[in-house]
From Swiss-Prot:
This is Large ribosomal subunit protein uL15. The keyword Oxidoreductase does not apply. NCBIfam families: rplO_bact. It comes from the Bacteria.
C-alpha cells in the first residue's frame, strides 16, 4: 500500500447531481428551483435576517456594549514571566525590550499566574491584589 495507490472504497463516493442538464437527469430545465419567483432567479433570495418586511429581530432589540479602545493597547503580564527577567526593576519599556508584551502596548497589568521568588521593583504598571501580595511576599515592592 502506497499513498499514490490509496482510493475510496467502490461506491463510497457518489457523484453530485448535475442540475440543469436536460429532463432525463431529473433536475433539468428549472434545476430544482421551481417556476418563477425570487428564489428561482440567479442571485435571488433574501439576505440573512430578512423577515419579509417585518422589523427584523436585530433591529427590534436594543444596542448594548462597546469595544474599549484602551483594552486594545493594554497587555497582561503573568508573574512567572517576571521571574524569567534578569533585571530587578520592571517597567513597561523593559517588558517591551524583553518582548514580553507587544511594542504597541501603552499599558500593562501584572496578574497572579505562577509564582515569583526573586524580589523585583515594579514601576508604573497595574498590579492585581493577588499579584501585589505575591510580589511583596517575595521581598519586592510596587512603585506607582
Amino acid at each position: 500500500m502506497r499513498l499514490n495507490t490509496l482510493s475510496p472504497a467502490q461506491g463510497a463516493k457518489q457523484a453530485p447531481k448535475r442540475v440543469g442538464r436536460g429532463i432525463g437527469s431529473g433536475l433539468g430545465k428549472t434545476g430544482g428551483r421551481g417556476h418563477k419567483g425570487q428564489n428561482s432567479r440567479t442571485g435571488g433570495g433574501v439576505r440573512r435576517g430578512f423577515e419579509g418586511g417585518q422589523m427584523p429581530l436585530y433591529r427590534r432589540l436594543p444596542k448594548f456594549g462597546f469595544i474599549s479602545r484602551k483594552a486594545m493597547v493594554t497587555a497582561e503580564v503573568r508573574l512567572f514571566q517576571l521571574a524569567l527577567l534578569e533585571t530587578d526593576v520592571v517597567d513597561i519599556n523593559i517588558l517591551k525590550a524583553c518582548k514580553i508584551i507587544p511594542y504597541q502596548s501603552q499599558y500593562a497589568k501584572i496578574i497572579l499566574s505562577g509564582t515569583i521568588e526573586i524580589p523585583v521593583i515594579i514601576r508604573g504598571l497595574g498590579v492585581t491584589k493577588g499579584a501585589r501580595a505575591a510580589i511583596e511576599a517575595a521581598g519586592g515592592k510596587i512603585e506607582e
